[in-house]
Amino acid sequence: MRLRLIAVGSRMPKWVEEGWHEYAKRMPSELALELVEIPLNTRGKNADVARFIRQEGEAMLAKVQPGERIVTLEVQGKPWSTEQLAVELDRWRLDARTVNLMVGGPEGLAPEVCARSEQRWSLSPLTLPHPLVRILIGEQMYRAWTVLSGHPYHK
């Protein structure tokens, strides 16, 4: 099974790439953690933001193969504790489908992406910077795996 983070935005600072890779390399090979970056359309003061969101959504969905699970990260999603995330991760693992975790751009996800979502997850009611979200997701996936495997990382 693969866990794939599909996120709008590229060219992240080095600390973001290092943070993401640190947790991705800790994951076992049977739960590979992969990052797919969707380029962010340049926003100007007269930008057609609705069109950009739609284009970004189309690009995100183009990375998803038929039958794969889509989990959107949304403010209105369901908050999961670490233990609840571990339960979800175990369900996903038993389901054996690739899980695509979708993170939109500054204005959020396209409605078409949300409509395809099987689950909606909220990391926090706080507004989080997108670079930090990548690291948080990587760390939380690793932490959930350690809960399932009895590893002492999560105490």
Curated annotation (Swiss-Prot):
It is an enzyme of class 2 (transferase). This is Ribosomal RNA large subunit methyltransferase H. GO terms for cellular component: cytoplasm. Keywords: Cytoplasm, Methyltransferase, rRNA processing, S-adenosyl-L-methionine, Transferase. GO terms for molecular function: rRNA (pseudouridine-N3-)-methyltransferase activity. The gene is rlmH. The lineage of its organism: Bacteria, Pseudomonadati, Pseudomonadota, Gammaproteobacteria, Pseudomonadales. S-adenosyl-L-methionine binds at residues 73, 104, 123-128. NCBIfam families: PRK00103.1-4 (NF000986), tRNA_RlmH_YbeA (TIGR00246). Specifically methylates the pseudouridine at position 1915 (m3Psi1915) in 23S rRNA. CDD domains: RlmH-like. HAMAP family: 23SrRNA_methyltr_H. It is found in: Cytoplasm. Its EC number is 2.1.1.177. It holds the Pfam family SPOUT_MTase. Homodimer.
